[in-house]
């Protein structure tokens, strides 16, 4: 059970099953009630309490017997039973010991035990009665003998600290003269702390009862919380079924009240009465030695010691140990009730049920996750595994006495058994078998989804130009390095696995159609039929007058169709054809050898220069001084002005001459040609007569052909003279055997190949060096004149846009919606106003009703006391009889 409960404490970080304890390294809050933490078993969730009221009747009547001489008998008398030993081990850690002895080292234990015999100050013993010497001297000789005889055994088991810390014990008889202490009813009632590990309960009860019977001096001290009995306390029952192996090594403490002056006086008085001090069991000792220590304690509750009980003085001053504030603990409350075994079993069963429910919930979640997860395809290596082959040595064949193969060498294979044997292919990866429907015929046409099945799921459309540019610029993904986490991945799970069908959650769509009320423009079938029927009834046929031109001239309204001339094919004059023809001519003709032939020299060259014009004599240059200076140019200008003035002085009359009119050219005169349509007489009679004649001729020709087709004409018999017999069989001549020479043929082919290559090289050079200009045919062709468009002008007519119609409809809809919303708001406001008015009236009515109105004093009719009509009671003397009483007494 303990192991099961320990599983609840799992560390989420390190995933370790370990119990959780309080970290005492952290400074704790100083509190007098801090000891209550140790009164609760935090690992099991059960409080720790001890039943001190249980008393063993046998221990009460068992006196202290003298020690026999036999050491074996001494063990039987002194030692406890096996049950008592277990009691001592289990109760030892639960009974409080000195706070100093628990947390001190062994050397500290010795010093603390020796310091207990030191003298106490006189102030601490003022209110305590003197301890009688008889209480100390009444230690029997038998007890001293028992202590001396068990010296050897205890020395081996107890450490030095335990031996030194043991003090003198007192018997039950020596505590008879202890003064009785009056009990005061105070609240709260703190519990007294005792130091002995095993027999402190019994000794404490004996001391209190003996002291209360002899002494009657009143003291102002706090009474004990419970009435102690003289009997030996039985084994305390623990509420928790937890094992006590770990707790037996570290003794816990009982509840200890705060240290006050009264508590110090009571503790010093109890220590003076001879209460034994506690022995600290070292946690380093094994369990076997601890059990041995517990077994060596006497039934009366005294530990065996080598030294006899020392004589105590009248005033024993002890050094009181002080508990650190960190270690102040509170015990379980005295009113804590213990659970029975049945209740503990029921709690344990409930815990198991909770754990089972949690495990079932986890398993259900795990099963659900496994069920919904994608199946993992097995990973198969692309490379086949290495197949080991046996070594075959040539020397193995030499060991055989014969070379023939025996039946043992060959394995007998069952042919029939191997027919249906399945041999898996290791090269192909084995996946999950997917059932597919069987079809006798299948459509080869791929769908749009199947065409992109090879692409990834996130396929997006790309333009061809973008795809081509990315193909030339970007590096494909297959050439990019991948991380190790992606390289070591197995095959991806199948994406085409059908998903698990789930229930469709119906949801009401939030449609806005209920708020829209568009006019219905479409008419129904019945309305359409009624409309057509009405149109048919209203329709009246009215013939239009015939155009007289139709009756007079047949060709009216018929357009003359001008037949186009048939296309005349013109051959293409391609340059490549010319080149091919020239190439063929060059191949046939042999190259002419160029020979230099000198032409006769003309006689004019010898007579003189030919083609050179005569040299003209250049004129002599006339030197002129350049007019560099501006002054000279100004002088020349002034001289010219003076000459003009002189000339004007000579002319007495001033003559004004008009400037000539510039020649503006030939004036533009538009040449407008006025064409007039001159009506000419015309008639269609000739054309009609010609068409009738052609029609009659065609009809006669058709009749003649039909008559000719109806006439019977017999076909002549075939001429069978040329095919009178069986044709002769053509006999092919037999193949004539002729020798062949591979060497000559190969040499001839090589020679032809070399010639062919030389010709091709020569042609390439000639074609590369030759320049051929294309003929300038464009010089002799007519210039390009664009034709005028025959399309009619665009007819711009009125049109109605659908957006305008929809805008008008939308405007009407918005107006209707606004009016409807306005009506709703008005109605809502009216309802709210009515509601407010009703509420106001109700409040006013309640206020009016709540006003107290005193009721008027009612005046009733006065009560008339009428005399009674019954007669008065007439008193009569009763008739007493003694007969009944006499008969009852006699019987």
Curated annotation (Swiss-Prot):
Keywords: Cytoplasm, Cytoskeleton, Nucleus. Residues 42-54, 442-454, 803-822, 831-852 have a biased composition (Basic and acidic residues). Residues 236-246 have a biased composition (Basic residues). Pfam families: TPX2 (PF06886), TPX2_importin (PF12214). InterPro entries: TPX2_C, TPX2_central_dom, TPX2_fam. The keyword Nucleus applies. Its main location: nucleus. Residues 108-124, 155-173, 791-802 have a biased composition (Polar residues). It is found in: Nucleus; Cytoplasm, Cytoskeleton, Spindle. One of its GO terms (biological process) is regulation of mitotic spindle organization. Detectable in immature oocytes. Residues 42-310, 418-454, 472-518, 723-746, 789-891 are annotated as: Disordered. Residues 141-154 have a biased composition (Acidic residues). It comes from the Eukaryota. GO terms for cellular component: cytoplasm; microtubule; nucleus; spindle. Spindle assembly factor. Required for normal assembly of mitotic spindles. Belongs to the TPX2 family. This is Targeting protein for Xklp2 homolog. The lineage of its organism: Eukaryota, Metazoa, Echinodermata, Eleutherozoa, Asterozoa. The gene is TPX2.
